[in-house]
Amino acid sequence: MITPGERRVVMNNVASLSMLQAITYLLPAIIIPYLFRVIGPEKFGLIAFAQAFVQYFIILTDYGFSISATKEISLCRDEHAKVCKAFSSVMTVKIALAFLSLLILGIIVYFIPKFRNDWLVYVLSFGAVVGNTIFPVWFFQGTEKMRYIADINIIGGIIVAVFIFLFVRGPQDYLLVPLIYSCVSLITGLWGQYIVFRRFRVSFKLQGYKNIRRQLAAGWDIFISIAAINAYTTTRVFTVGLLTNNTITGFYSIAEKIANFCQTFPLTSFSQALFPRLSKIFHRNKIKAFKIMQRLQQIAINIALICLPLIFIFAHVIVRVVCGGDYQKTVLSLRLLLISVFFISANAFRVQFLLVCGKTHIYSRIHVIMAMVGLPLIFLLIYAFSYVGAAVATVAIEAGIFTITYFTVRRLRFS
């Protein structure tokens, strides 16, 4: 069992991340209806499409450090020299990847008409990539100081909301939306860096090729997995935008935001808070860590079986409150996506355990296989059934991941 001290640390981190996730999704629940009415569904859909597009660059700059660097920091956090070396190596790679991302963005915007026509939206949205690159969320997770993540992002979210309500007054102001998000993202990223240098006394030193290569190797399997996951998550909104229009993209993206809230709060917060602690427990006692995972997974399943049917029944009410109207496209999409949320909830701790016990290659293989199946499935179903196809594809993919992971983890043996 987890000791009282370990439980207290985990629960403090759960509280911080849960508050962060609540604000992260509740603020858009206030902002989205306002933006939808003020700038209109077409511009709203364009911004959602741009956000989905730049998400690919966020994935690239994150690489796999959200897992690999978190784990490394959690294991060496009492050795200051090793922490500084890890921090410097990770930040060097992330900054280099950010410059590569900017180059790719420039090429796409210049040569592809769909992007060139609204180039300023994509350029302004790219600021979120820079902010995410420099914000050391992985460092705070590894040191189990999640309250810094929560405090910074909650304040940032409130600033975004205030600025949008003050300055976005009509369709002509739609460019201010990505500008505000990007500026605040940059500020929060710099704030996070300040805390790392000032509070943790971490120093940045240029690292040699050997250390950089080691970080790239450590994060590779995770990066491939995350890239594969986003091949069938971020790609849904992106593909809806490519194959339909900005208005339909707006309706569907709202449904995804609501479904993501149901998935993230508080499940993702709890799994993120537990990951560094469970990694340390596994290092000492493999059987104990496995039993903790099984117990937590069953709790997550029970909660999902209680909450998700209620959300399904009252989906039309939720959509009316969030969106300010009875949008049947959004209601139908949400109800379908809730089925996928169940499979995600029933698999959250189980699939994370593959990372805890160092089976990153298996974790990667599962998601790469599902990406290879899911990506063409998404395009085919969206082409045939529009936004409904995106939701149906999501259910099929998450059910497949659940099934493969369940039987894979059952076969694990620990000595």
What are these regions (language model features)?
Residues 1-10, 174-181, 187-233, 277-291, ...:
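Interhelical loop/hinge segments that connect adjacent transmembrane helices in multipass membrane
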Residues 62-78, 255, 259-284, 351-356:
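Helix-loop junctions and terminal segments of transmembrane helices
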Residues 119, 129-153, 339-368:
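Membrane-interface junctions at transmembrane-helix termini in multi-pass inner-membrane proteins
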